[in-house]
Design a protein with these regions (language model features):
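Short, Lys/Arg-enriched N-terminal segment that forms or immediately precedes the first helix
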Residues: 12-20, 111-112, 133-136
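Short, flexible active-site-proximal loops enriched in glycine and acidic residues
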Residues: 98-106
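Basic, Lys/Arg- and aromatic-enriched nucleic-acid-binding interface segment
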Residues: 10-39, 43
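N-terminal export signals and maturation junctions of secreted/periplasmic proteins
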Residues: 1-10
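Conserved tyrosine-mediated DNA breakage-rejoining catalytic core shared by Y-recombinases
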Residues: 48-85
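C-terminal catalytic core of Y-nucleophile DNA break-rejoin enzymes
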Residues: 5, 71-90, 106-129
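Short, basic (Lys/Arg/His-rich) helix/loop patches that form interaction surfaces
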Residues: 20-25, 126-157
Length: 157
Protein backbone atom coordinates (compact mmCIF):
# COMPACT_ATOMS: atom_id res chain seq x y z
CA UNK A 1 0.00 0.00 0.00
CA UNK A 2 1.39 3.39 -1.00
CA UNK A 3 1.61 6.20 1.50
CA UNK A 4 -0.55 9.20 0.66
CA UNK A 5 1.21 12.49 0.12
CA UNK A 6 0.00 16.03 0.77
CA UNK A 7 -0.21 18.54 -2.05
CA UNK A 8 2.64 20.84 -1.04
CA UNK A 9 2.90 23.25 -3.97
CA UNK A 10 0.42 26.16 -3.56
CA UNK A 11 -0.10 26.46 -7.34
CA UNK A 12 -0.82 22.73 -7.62
CA UNK A 13 -3.23 23.03 -4.71
CA UNK A 14 -5.14 25.89 -6.33
CA UNK A 15 -5.37 24.00 -9.61
CA UNK A 16 -6.53 20.85 -7.76
CA UNK A 17 -9.19 22.78 -5.83
CA UNK A 18 -10.42 24.36 -9.04
CA UNK A 19 -10.64 21.19 -11.13
CA UNK A 20 -14.27 20.39 -10.26
CA UNK A 21 -15.12 24.08 -10.10
CA UNK A 22 -13.75 25.35 -13.42
CA UNK A 23 -12.27 22.60 -15.60
CA UNK A 24 -14.97 19.99 -15.15
CA UNK A 25 -17.70 21.65 -13.05
CA UNK A 26 -19.25 19.22 -10.59
CA UNK A 27 -20.58 20.82 -7.37
CA UNK A 28 -20.72 17.60 -5.31
CA UNK A 29 -17.15 16.60 -6.12
CA UNK A 30 -15.93 20.16 -5.58
CA UNK A 31 -17.56 20.22 -2.14
CA UNK A 32 -15.94 16.90 -1.21
CA UNK A 33 -12.49 18.27 -2.00
CA UNK A 34 -13.12 21.63 -0.29
CA UNK A 35 -14.48 19.94 2.86
CA UNK A 36 -11.51 17.59 3.03
CA UNK A 37 -8.96 20.35 2.52
CA UNK A 38 -10.59 22.76 4.98
CA UNK A 39 -11.66 20.46 7.82
CA UNK A 40 -9.07 17.65 7.92
CA UNK A 41 -11.88 15.18 8.57
CA UNK A 42 -11.31 11.56 7.62
CA UNK A 43 -13.04 10.50 4.42
CA UNK A 44 -15.33 8.14 6.37
CA UNK A 45 -16.59 11.09 8.43
CA UNK A 46 -17.00 13.32 5.36
CA UNK A 47 -19.01 10.70 3.46
CA UNK A 48 -21.34 10.23 6.43
CA UNK A 49 -22.20 13.93 6.72
CA UNK A 50 -25.87 14.74 6.31
CA UNK A 51 -27.50 18.03 5.36
CA UNK A 52 -28.63 18.51 8.97
CA UNK A 53 -24.95 18.68 10.01
CA UNK A 54 -24.27 21.70 7.79
CA UNK A 55 -27.64 23.40 7.31
CA UNK A 56 -30.16 24.62 9.88
CA UNK A 57 -33.50 23.93 8.19
CA UNK A 58 -35.52 25.84 10.83
CA UNK A 59 -33.42 28.99 10.49
CA UNK A 60 -32.87 28.57 6.74
CA UNK A 61 -29.10 29.09 6.87
CA UNK A 62 -25.81 27.23 7.02
CA UNK A 63 -24.50 26.32 10.42
CA UNK A 64 -21.33 27.92 11.78
CA UNK A 65 -19.85 24.57 12.81
CA UNK A 66 -20.10 20.89 11.97
CA UNK A 67 -20.61 18.86 15.15
CA UNK A 68 -20.05 15.14 14.71
CA UNK A 69 -18.78 12.09 16.53
CA UNK A 70 -15.75 10.81 14.65
CA UNK A 71 -16.15 7.21 13.53
CA UNK A 72 -12.58 6.12 14.18
CA UNK A 73 -12.01 7.71 17.58
CA UNK A 74 -15.55 8.13 18.92
CA UNK A 75 -14.68 11.71 19.91
CA UNK A 76 -17.14 14.55 19.54
CA UNK A 77 -15.70 17.18 17.22
CA UNK A 78 -16.84 20.65 16.29
CA UNK A 79 -15.33 22.16 13.14
CA UNK A 80 -15.78 25.68 11.78
CA UNK A 81 -17.51 26.00 8.42
CA UNK A 82 -15.37 28.67 6.74
CA UNK A 83 -16.40 30.82 3.78
CA UNK A 84 -14.85 28.43 1.24
CA UNK A 85 -16.98 25.58 2.56
CA UNK A 86 -20.15 27.68 2.71
CA UNK A 87 -19.65 28.84 -0.90
CA UNK A 88 -19.13 25.23 -2.02
CA UNK A 89 -22.22 24.13 -0.07
CA UNK A 90 -24.27 26.91 -1.59
CA UNK A 91 -23.21 26.01 -5.14
CA UNK A 92 -24.00 22.35 -4.50
CA UNK A 93 -27.37 23.16 -2.93
CA UNK A 94 -28.28 25.39 -5.89
CA UNK A 95 -27.36 22.63 -8.33
CA UNK A 96 -29.63 20.21 -6.48
CA UNK A 97 -32.47 22.73 -6.42
CA UNK A 98 -32.07 23.20 -10.17
CA UNK A 99 -32.56 19.47 -10.67
CA UNK A 100 -35.77 19.56 -8.56
CA UNK A 101 -34.11 17.57 -5.77
CA UNK A 102 -35.94 18.24 -2.51
CA UNK A 103 -33.23 18.19 0.16
CA UNK A 104 -34.20 16.65 3.49
CA UNK A 105 -32.26 17.07 6.77
CA UNK A 106 -31.45 13.35 6.96
CA UNK A 107 -30.13 13.17 3.36
CA UNK A 108 -26.44 12.43 2.94
CA UNK A 109 -24.40 15.29 1.49
CA UNK A 110 -22.50 13.01 -0.87
CA UNK A 111 -25.15 10.65 -2.15
CA UNK A 112 -25.71 8.89 -5.43
CA UNK A 113 -27.93 10.70 -7.92
CA UNK A 114 -31.15 8.79 -7.29
CA UNK A 115 -30.54 7.20 -3.89
CA UNK A 116 -29.97 8.49 -0.40
CA UNK A 117 -26.87 6.40 0.22
CA UNK A 118 -23.42 7.97 0.46
CA UNK A 119 -20.91 7.44 -2.31
CA UNK A 120 -18.32 4.80 -1.46
CA UNK A 121 -14.77 5.43 -0.31
CA UNK A 122 -13.66 3.92 -3.62
CA UNK A 123 -15.73 6.44 -5.59
CA UNK A 124 -14.33 9.27 -3.46
CA UNK A 125 -10.81 7.97 -4.13
CA UNK A 126 -11.48 7.83 -7.87
CA UNK A 127 -12.73 11.39 -8.11
CA UNK A 128 -9.83 12.74 -6.03
CA UNK A 129 -7.30 10.70 -8.02
CA UNK A 130 -8.83 11.87 -11.32
CA UNK A 131 -8.56 15.54 -10.34
CA UNK A 132 -4.93 15.05 -9.26
CA UNK A 133 -4.05 13.27 -12.50
CA UNK A 134 -5.76 15.88 -14.67
CA UNK A 135 -3.88 18.60 -12.79
CA UNK A 136 -0.64 16.62 -13.22
CA UNK A 137 0.10 16.53 -9.51
CA UNK A 138 2.94 14.14 -8.72
CA UNK A 139 3.05 11.82 -5.76
CA UNK A 140 0.54 9.37 -4.37
CA UNK A 141 -2.71 11.28 -4.02
CA UNK A 142 -5.65 9.65 -2.25
CA UNK A 143 -8.51 10.55 0.08
CA UNK A 144 -6.07 10.84 2.97
CA UNK A 145 -4.08 13.41 0.98
CA UNK A 146 -6.82 15.95 1.71
CA UNK A 147 -6.26 15.53 5.45
CA UNK A 148 -2.48 15.56 5.04
CA UNK A 149 -2.60 18.67 2.86
CA UNK A 150 -4.59 20.48 5.56
CA UNK A 151 -1.97 19.53 8.14
CA UNK A 152 0.97 20.42 5.92
CA UNK A 153 -0.30 23.91 5.10
CA UNK A 154 -1.43 24.58 8.69
CA UNK A 155 2.07 23.64 9.85
CA UNK A 156 3.66 25.89 7.20
CA UNK A 157 1.82 28.92 8.56
Amino acid sequence: MNTAHPIRNPEDLEQFKGYYQYQKPHPRNYLLIILGLNTALRISDILNLRWEHVYDFQMGRYRNHISIIEQKTGKKTSILLNQNIVRALSWYQQSLSGSNKNIQPQDFLFCHKNENVPISRVQAFRLIKKAAERCQISGTISCHSLRKTFGYHAWQQ
